Curated annotation (Swiss-Prot):
Sorted UniProt keywords: ATP-binding, Lipid biosynthesis, Lipid metabolism, Lyase, Nucleotide-binding, Steroid biosynthesis, Steroid metabolism, Sterol biosynthesis, Sterol metabolism
GO biological process: isopentenyl diphosphate biosynthetic process, mevalonate pathway; sterol biosynthetic process
NCBIfam families the UniProt entry points to: mevDPdecarb
Gene3D superfamilies: 3.30.230.10, GHMP kinase, C-terminal domain
Database matches in PANTHER family: DIPHOSPHOMEVALONATE DECARBOXYLASE
Induction, as annotated: Expression is high in media supplemented with glucose, moderate in acetate, galactose and low in maltose medium. Expression is higher in the yeast phase than in the hyphal phase of growth as well as higher in the exponential than in the stationary phase. Expression is affected by antifungals. Expression is repressed during biofilm formation.
Cysteines paired by S-S bonds: none
Protein name per Swiss-Prot or TrEMBL: Diphosphomevalonate decarboxylase
Native source species: Candida albicans (strain SC5314 / ATCC MYA-2876) (Yeast)
Gene of this entry: MVD
């Protein structure tokens, strides 16, 4: 049996991907930017094994046997096998591309709870099989394969600050992830995640995207005017380590994304009352100067970015209301508990996929 294990990170978009121009290839209607979070707190661990004794491809996720028959997963496996077959010409090279695969995967966070589990999952799957197959392709090339599994997964193939360039080619060959800056560029950036709900969301992302593209009038303006300008401005803010500008663009883009969801017909609600309270709290924190930035993906959970220098200022107010829930690494004075948050995750910026000796197969 041949085996390889990899951990892959969660990434949280600061410039949102929402809308596909090609559903089967997962080609986006706009470019996006994300921050890769530390795998100490959020990661998917995947072990990929190949053996002549395996009768069929199988996947276990968090201990449960899952189907591999989805078109997205099949596209990833086919691309990876094709790349492996191209380096198997020598009679001495094991024909791994012809063997069935067993893939075992575990998250250390709730799956499908708005914490980008599919992104980490497909990034781990592609990275583990690429490692198993000893593929020579770089991460940008592999990101095109991960993209077919889950659009935002392509961004989890890099650490630090990442751009997914939408590309223009119909076959998607130029729709890939690239590094804007490594995690060492801005190591003092921190994130705190407020888990508002561990439940699966009412409107899955793919369904929501299709509805928005088909029915929202605001959407066309967002992808044609708003995002292209913001994309360049946000890259500059990251490279300049300009937190107030980065924060403003991040919050505005979160608002813009949820505005097109609301403008969809029927409207899509991802934020709930707790989410809105958190937005108000961040506005309170930022009254004197901008030191915190909220962003919400397709769900009610909040991610708040801040610089380590302002940690006490940012976390003390959040702790005041949410100090009673688990997950805190630092402690302040808790006064007025606000219901609606089940736990918090304090984290930082992290690297891309990492090879590990930890194996999920015996």
């Amino acid at each position: 049996m041949y085996s390889a294990s990899v951990t892959a990170p969660v990434n949280i978009a600061t410039l949102k991907y929402w809308g596909k121009r090609d559903k089967s290839l997962n080609l986006p209607t706009n470019s996006s930017i994300s921050v890769t979070l530390s795998q100490d707190d959020l990661r998917t661990l995947t072990t990929a094994s190949a053996s002549e004794s395996f009768e069929k491809d199988q996947l276990w996720l968090n201990g449960k046997l899952e189907s591999l028959d989805t078109p997205r997963t099949q596209a990833c496996l086919a691309d990876l096998r094709k790349l492996r077959a191209s380096i198997e010409q020598s009679p001495d090279t094991p024909k791994l591309s012809q063997m069935k695969l067993h893939i075992v995967s575990e998250n250390n966070f709730p799956t499908a709870a708005g914490l980008a589990s599919s992104a980490a999952g497909f990034a781990a799957l592609v990275s583990a099989i690429a490692k198993l197959y000893e593929l020579p392709q770089d991460m940008s090339e592999l990101s095109k394969i991960a993209r077919k599994g889950s659009g935002s997964a392509c961004r989890s193939l890099f650490g630090g600050f990442v751009a997914w360039e939408m590309g223009t080619l119909p076959d998607g060959q130029d729709s890939k992830a690239v590094e804007i800056a490594p995690l060492e560029h801005w190591p003092s950036l921190r994130a705190v995640i407020l888990v508002v709900s561990d439940d699966k969301k009412d409107t899955p992302s793919t369904t929501g995207m299709q509805s928005t593209v088909a029915t929202s009038d605001l959407f066309a303006h967002r992808i044609a005017e708003v995002v292209p300008q913001r994309f360049e401005a946000m890259k500059k803010a990251i490279l300049d380590k300009d937190f107030p500008k980065f924060a403003e663009l991040t919050m505005k883009d979160s608002n813009s994304f949820h505005a097109v969801c609301l403008d969809s017909y029927p409207p899509i609600f991802y934020l709930n009352d707790t989410s809105k309270k958190i937005i108000k709290m961040v506005e309170t924190i930022n009254q004197q100067e901008v030191v915190a930035a909220y962003t919400f993906d397709a769900g009610p959970n909040a991610v708040i970015y801040y610089d380590e220098a302002n940690q006490d200022k940012v976390l003390s107010l959040l702790y005041k209301h949410f100090g009673h829930v688990p997950g805190w690494k630092t402690h302040y004075t808790a006064e007025t508990p606000v219901a609606g948050v089940s736990r918090i995750i304090q984290t930082s910026i992290g690297p891309g996929p990492q090879e590990t000796s930890e194996s999920l197969t015996k």
